[in-house]
Amino acid sequence: MDILTLGWVSVLVLFTWSISMVVWGRNGF
């Protein structure tokens, strides 16, 4: 795995995590 792939994976993980935090926040968690 090269640095470009690792960068894209970290960006996708961070994006998915932030979306789930927003969804949980709206649900009252």
Swiss-Prot record:
InterPro entries: Cytochr_b6-f_cplx_su8_sf (IPR036143), Cytochrome_b6-f_cplx_su8 (IPR005497). GO terms for molecular function: electron transporter, transferring electrons within cytochrome b6/f complex of photosystem II activity. It is a single-pass membrane protein. One of its GO terms (biological process) is cytochrome complex assembly. The chain crosses the membrane at residues 3-23. Keywords: Electron transport, Membrane, Photosynthesis, Thylakoid, Transmembrane, Transmembrane helix, Transport. One of its GO terms (cellular component) is plasma membrane-derived thylakoid membrane. It is found in: Cellular thylakoid membrane. Its main location: membrane. It holds the Pfam family PetN. It comes from the Bacteria. NCBIfam families: PRK14747.1. Component of the cytochrome b6-f complex, which mediates electron transfer between photosystem II (PSII) and photosystem I (PSI), cyclic electron flow around PSI, and state transitions. Belongs to the PetN family. The 4 large subunits of the cytochrome b6-f complex are cytochrome b6, subunit IV (17 kDa polypeptide, PetD), cytochrome f and the Rieske protein, while the 4 small subunits are PetG, PetL, PetM and PetN. The complex functions as a dimer. This is Cytochrome b6-f complex subunit 8. It comes from Synechocystis sp. (strain ATCC 27184 / PCC 6803 / Kazusa).
